[in-house]
Amino acid sequence: MNIIFWGTPIFCVPILEKLLKSNHNVLAVITQPDRRRGRGNKVLPSPIKQKALEENLPIYTPVNITKEKDIQAKIKQYNADIFVVVAFGQILPKSVLKLPKYGCWNIHASLLPRWRGAAPIQWSILSGDSETGVGLMAMEEGLDTGAVLLEKKLKLKLLENAEQLSQRLKDLSCNLIIEGIEILEKVREQSQSLSKLNLTKQEDINRTYSYARLLMKEDYLINWNDSGYNIHKQILGLYPNCYTYINSKRLKVLESIPINNKYDEFLDFRYKDIILKSQSIINNNGLIIDIIENIGIIVQTKDVPLLITKVKLEGKKESSQNALIQQLTLTNSQNKLGE
């Protein structure tokens, strides 16, 4: 198959690599323009553009593909069999969708129609989903509304953060796209139309529709008056950027465990007394209620106490266990987070 690949973030890179190592031909790459990013706020290419440069592939970077007819004309000249689209970052217009002979196919990191939109991985964790996956969808003009050709599922792990889940979904996606292209090749070989494909309309899938909206700055700030379970999901889902304050310094919270029997296998200490202590504290959420050597600190929340095992204090390196304890107790005379 002759393919044009559309994508932008790091999530896409292994999928492009998989296609490049296959017996298929990647003709060109379309990605978002260079943008300011990183600590130095320098103008940098997208991860996909970096990979395409390494492979000497033709690259196009439309600001708005709908309006840029010159780029559309250049793409048309490739006469591609299919477009593979993974987190490109723009909605493709009908004039682009109709170009490839065997369709535009989007890999989406959720089990559609659940978590259509920009941040499906984060929202699956934030919402406490037990299962997620990836789907290969026939693209249409709507946002993630197309019929599904294939999907692969996985179970979320209790302490799995967004970075770890993303890696597992990348691996699934690499297998998914090769399987999907094999199906499309059979259609081509048999001179059949795409109407012969066994596609499932999303309205026929027995799942609740939900929208994975873009994340905002305020989503990353921990509210210690919230449930400990919700805070834990926030830390996992927004890894590694969830934060609080300690003596007016920003503190990223990287790892946590709710102190509850559901997480018993991860708690290497007796915690019943801590739960009793927590239950006796009223209206003091964010308080560090205990410090356990070689493990971490325990923080009061609305319901269950939360064990914090790894942090990054503003201007410091990541710290865990005793280094975390020393850093926070020296910084925080009031023994409280969120202030």
From Swiss-Prot:
UniProt organism field: Prochlorococcus marinus (strain SARG / CCMP1375 / SS120)
Q: Which UniProt keywords apply?
A: Protein biosynthesis, Transferase
Function of the protein: Attaches a formyl group to the free amino group of methionyl-tRNA(fMet). The formyl group appears to play a dual role in the initiator identity of N-formylmethionyl-tRNA by promoting its recognition by IF2 and preventing the misappropriation of this tRNA by the elongation apparatus.
Q: What class of enzyme is it?
A: transferase
Q: Which PANTHER family does the entry mention?
A: METHIONYL-TRNA FORMYLTRANSFERASE, METHIONYL-TRNA FORMYLTRANSFERASE, MITOCHONDRIAL
Record's family? Belongs to the Fmt family.
Under the cellular component aspect of Gene Ontology, which terms does the record hold?
cytosol
Residues recorded as binding (6S)-5,6,7,8-tetrahydrofolate, renumbered to this chain, are S110, L111, L112, P113
The Gene Ontology terms for molecular function here are: methionyl-tRNA formyltransferase activity
Reaction catalysis annotation: L-methionyl-tRNA(fMet) + (6R)-10-formyltetrahydrofolate = N-formyl-L-methionyl-tRNA(fMet) + (6S)-5,6,7,8-tetrahydrofolate + H(+)
Any idea what this protein is called? Methionyl-tRNA formyltransferase
Q: What's the Enzyme Commission number for this chain?
A: 2.1.2.9
Gene coding for it:
fmt
